[in-house]
Structures are given as structure tokens and as C-alpha cells.
Regions:
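Bacterial Sec-dependent N-terminal signal peptides
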Residues: 1-21
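Mature catalytic domains of secreted/periplasmic carbohydrate-active enzymes
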Residues: 20-429
């Protein structure tokens, strides 16, 4: 197995950039496979911006001077935060990993760091490290933990070139100092917190500068070669990265305008979306996605060989609002019943159809019918292998099918349908 993984690394993972080549270790390749198996994750945006109830970009959108914004730390005291509740929320929803903001664009660190006093332990009356509690609880409950980390910083004086969205920032910073600061924090996150499996970078898109990824990625993989690195730069994968992400779009789509240059590479894929229209807590955003829409996003992502990372913004007191818990309880019940067709699957290579998608695991194909076709059957083109059996996943009842040279017809007459996703399991030889 180890030799096979190393060979995969040389064929798929090694990306040449100049004279340097990143070759992932066997442990890293195994972590990639496990990442793809998990399929469903929880994204959490939480910080002092949550107090204002207007999303994580409130400092920018409301043009709040940095010195004024920093005062929010004086009032941030999330006494209702409970790491166990967060982790169990994810588990009950069928999620296998959590990605949480360790530091967002406002520069405030949500963990105890020695690299800056502007952090939740030193700058707030809370004086505790919620990410340490979360990391420990994730280990206890068997949930993987990834840290979101912002590359840009709206407040630090050494953030080079200043920032056009914050009044009073110097035109020039100390780029070497800023890179050193990030490396110090990343070292803390990887070495201090138990069970960390990934780093999720964001903010590259603000400036066309040398982010010193060779140093930063090299440091991370030196500290822990199995750590998975992803970067929300909206570009094709770069040297040293281990998975590719897509923001608010499925791989290959560009409805948001973010993914115009995101050519799909050979790395594991992940797409992220919000449960309403905001990443951070927004008290006026009531545009909650239905459980059916979330299930469809999860299924469509899996059909395109991608994970689905669903975001919530907890309230400033640390609690998750009931609208989220109610919706995700329904999603979790569906995933518990139909997880065989999601977890551990890969995209079948068969293009998405008007009625749905197909996932694959071993010799089984899972036909996800999410939109009822006009005719009493679905047609599956380009199917390799001979189908020996077709059955409804929900109860194992037989489903009629006919295989021809051009594809397979699966007949839906008399099949008990699911309002979210009717899944038919095809077994091939």
C-alpha cells in the first residue's frame, strides 16, 4: 500500500515549479484519500466581528477605523461557547471534519498566540482558548480539525503595501516581518493543537505579491508532512498544495465569478457554501437554505468528486442558532440513512445528468435521482462494466434495468421515491 501511495504521489502529486518539486509523503497521500472519503465538513466563521451581527467583512463594509474596531475585543466574552456542543452538532449532521477560522482578515486571532497580543486569550475578558477546547473535543469524538488562516490582514502595520480598505494604514509595510509573523502563528497552530489535519488559506486574491509559499508550505510540511494545505486563491493548484477548493461553486462552474481561473487539477476537491448568505453571524440574514437544497449540494459535489464544506456563523455568545440546528438535524437523518452512497465514494466519471449525478465505490454505482425525469426511466451513458443488479438503496427492493451498447436504462415505474434524492444502487462485475 505504501509503495502504491508513493507512486501515486510521483504521478499525481508532484508539481514542478522552477527547480523545486513537491513530492507528498505516503502519509500525506493517505491523508488525501481519507479527506476524499469524508465528503462532508462543517465550516465555522467566528470572531469579534460576530458581535456586530453583520458578517465577517463588517469592518470593511461599514468603513470602521481599525483602532475603533479593535475595541470589540474588550467586549467579546462568549460564555455560552461549548466545544462539545459544536462537535456534536457536526456529528449529528453527518459531518466528518471541521474547518474553523483561527484568524480572519480583521487580524484578530481566535487562539492563544505568542506572536501577537491581539488574540482571544490576551485581549478579551474571556481569557480562554476556544480552539484548544475544540481541538481536544475533535480528537475525543473522532472528528478531523482544519484551521482557516487569513493571509491578508487589515490592521497590522507590517502588512506590506497597506490596505485600500482601512483608513490610516501606511503605504508600505515590512513584508519580511509579516511573513515571519505568519510562519510563527502557523507553527503554533500545527505544533500546539492536537489532531490538526489541514490548513485552509484565504486572502491571496487581495494582492498580487510574493506570498512566499515555498517557505510557508515548506514549513508546514516540515512540521507535519501529513498536513493538507489548500488555498482559496481562485486559481489552479500551486506547488505544495494538497487539495483544491472552490468558493460557492461546484467544480467546473463559475456562477459567482470567483472560479474563472480555477482550472481543475489532479488534487482532491472541495467546495464551500454558506447555510444562509453570510459567512459570519448576520442577525438580519434570514435566507436560510432548506435541508433539501443542502442535501442536493452535498450529492452534486460528491458526484463531481468533491467534498462539501457547509458554513455556519455562530452567535457572538458562542451558541449555534436554532435555525441551523433544526435544518442540519434533517440533513443528518438523511445522511445517516443514505451515507453508503456518499462516504468513501468518488465521482463516477459519468457527466451530471438533468435528473442528477452518479457516485461510485468499488464495483457499485449510486444513481442519485434528484429531479424526476419526464419519462419513466433514467438513462446512464458511458457506463463501463456489466450491470448485474439494480436495487433501491432505501429498502433493497429490485429495480428493473436494461443495458445496451450506448448505456443503461433504469426504470422508475413502481419505485418508491425520496423527496430529496432517490438512490438506486447498481452492482457491476
Amino acid at each position: 500500500m505504501i509503495k502504491k501511495l508513493l507512486l501515486m504521489g510521483m504521478l499525481l502529486g508532484a508539481v514542478r515549479a522552477g527547480a523545486q518539486t513537491y513530492t507528498p509523503t505516503a502519509d500525506n497521500l493517505a491523508a488525501r484519500q481519507n479527506f476524499q472519503d469524508m465528503k462532508f465538513g462543517l465550516f465555522i466563521h467566528w470572531g469579534i466581528y460576530s458581535e456586530l451581527g453583520a458578517g465577517e467583512w463588517v469592518m470593511n463594509e461599514k468603513h470602521i477605523p481599525y483602532d475603533s474596531y479593535k475595541r470589540l475585543a474588550d467586549f467579546f466574552n462568549p460564555q455560552a461557547f461549548n466545544a462539545h456542543d459544536w462537535v456534536m452538532f457536526a456529528k449529528k449532521a453527518g459531518m466528518k471534519y471541521i474547518t474553523v477560522t483561527s484568524r480572519h482578515h480583521d487580524g484578530f486571532s481566535m487562539f492563544g498566540t505568542k506572536a501577537s497580543p491581539y488574540n482571544i486569550v490576551d485581549a478579551t475578558p474571556y481569557h480562554k482558548d476556544p480552539l484548544m477546547e475544540l481541538a481536544q473535543e475533535c480528537v475525543k469524538e473522532g472528528i478531523e480539525l482544519h484551521f482557516y488562516y487569513s493571509l491578508l490582514d487589515w490592521g497590522r502595520k507590517d502588512y506590506a503595501y497597506g490596505s485600500p480598505i482601512v483608513d490610516g494604514k501606511p503605504a508600505n509595510g515590512d513584508w519580511d516581518s509579516y511573513i515571519s509573523f505568519m510562519k510563527a502563528q502557523l507553527t503554533e497552530l500545527i505544533t500546539k493543537y492536537p489532531g490538526v489535519k489541514g490548513i485552509w488559506f484565504d486572502g491571496h486574491w487581495e494582492r498580487d505579491v510574493n506570498w512566499h509559499y515555498d517557505e510557508i508550505y515548506g514549513l508546514i510540511h516540515k512540521l507535519n508532512p501529513a498536513i493538507l494545505i489548500g488555498n482559496n486563491h481562485h486559481l489552479a493548484p500551486k506547488e505544495g498544495e494538497d487539495f483544491q477548493m472552490f468558493e460557492k461553486d461546484l467544480p467546473g462552474a463559475n456562477t459567482t465569478g470567483f472560479s474563472g481561473k480555477s482550472k481543475i487539477g489532479a488534487l482532491p476537491l472541495e467546495t464551500c457554501e454558506t447555510i444562509n448568505n453570510s459567512w459570519g453571524f448576520n442577525i438580519t440574514d434570514r435566507s436560510f437554505k432548506s435541508s433539501k437544497r443542502i442535501i442536493h449540494y452535498l450529492v452534486n459535489a460528491a458526484g463531481l468528486n468533491a467534498n462539501f464544506l457547509l458554513n455556519i456563523g455562530p452567535m457572538p455568545n458562542g451558541k449555534i442558532q436554532p435555525e441551523f440546528t433544526d435544518t442540519l438535524a434533517v440533513v443528518g437523518a438523511w445522511v445517516q440513512k443514505n451515507g453508503e452512497a456518499i462516504y468513501g465514494t468518488r465521482g463516477s466519471g459519468i457527466p451530471a445528468q438533468p435528473w442528477g449525478v452518479i457516485t461510485q465505490k468499488d464495483k457499485n454505482l449510486y444513481v442519485h435521482v434528484m429531479t424526476a425525469p419526464q419519462q419513466p426511466y433514467v438513462f446512464i451513458p458511458q457506463l463501463k462494466g456489466k450491470v448485474t443488479k439494480a436495487a433501491l438503496l432505501a429498502d433493497g427492493s429490485a429495480v428493473k434495468f436494461k443495458q445496451q451498447t450506448e448505456g443503461v436504462f433504469v426504470y422508475l415505474s413502481g419505485v418508491a421515491t425520496d423527496p430529496n434524492d432517490t438512490i438506486i444502487k447498481l452492482t457491476t462485475n
